Amino acid sequence: MKTDIRNLDLNLLKALDALLDERSVTRAAERLALTQPAVSGMLTRLRECFDDPLFTRAQRGVVPTLRALELAQPVKAILAEVSELLQPKAFDAATAEMTIKIAATDYALRAVIVPFMAALRAQAPGIRVAVLPVNNEQLSAQFERGDIDIALITPDSAPPDLHARSLYDEEYVCLMREDHPLSAQTGLTLDSFCAQDHALVSYVGGNFKGVTDEALAAVGRSRRVTLSVCSFLVLPEILRVSDLISVVPRRLTHDLPGLKVLPPPLAIQGFNKIVVWHERTHRDAGHRWLRELLFSTAI
């Protein structure tokens, strides 16, 4: 049966979107600030419009049919376009009040968010920022639900359905305390580098090998890693009170008193940091301004 567009209205599409996201009539009703019977009635109308059950009852909530899943993205796109139509085009950063949600690692917190926040507070004091951990497996779903607006990741982690733009290329340097036995050297030798005890950062936790070890293996060498931590933020404190050295991204070494930076004695492949965002916020004036500020403040 062919759907008559005259039987559809915006509220029905909003109800369908809420049901697809929440998978529960009760939670969809709460999200829409409607009663449960009202949402059930809207679901009945939606079923008539699309000539499909759309959802079937489950032990907990409802399960979408294949037809409902096919409608998910088009419905979100329509609602986003309508929302954009209703929003004023002008954006005044000085008076704007909004919240932006950014997914970032602790590395990106220091390298990107710190300078971004300094500029944001000066130019747009009414904008709030929520920084959340990166969950690569859930990125697409988080963007679709509106849980995050921007993610700071590497290209290999970027879902294909997101907008992406390169932020910068990062390189690795060697970090140690100022009075470390190797700090007097103008350049590390491969022998002295490999003879030291090393610390590395493993986001998954517990790994004792990384890109440095891959580079060493390529030239037939190895090192001894005696400490593996899951955060870059604790590493400077550890290096200040020990003879450990560590290979870290260069942008993490700014403003670290008591520590010295030296180039590594071999080529270690760096990485590209990118910014990704969803079509939902792609054309929004406020989000465009925030993204441009992020790019302009990246060091």
What feature does the model see in each segment?
Residues 49-50, 71-93:
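Alpha-helical linker/hinge and terminal dimerization helices associated
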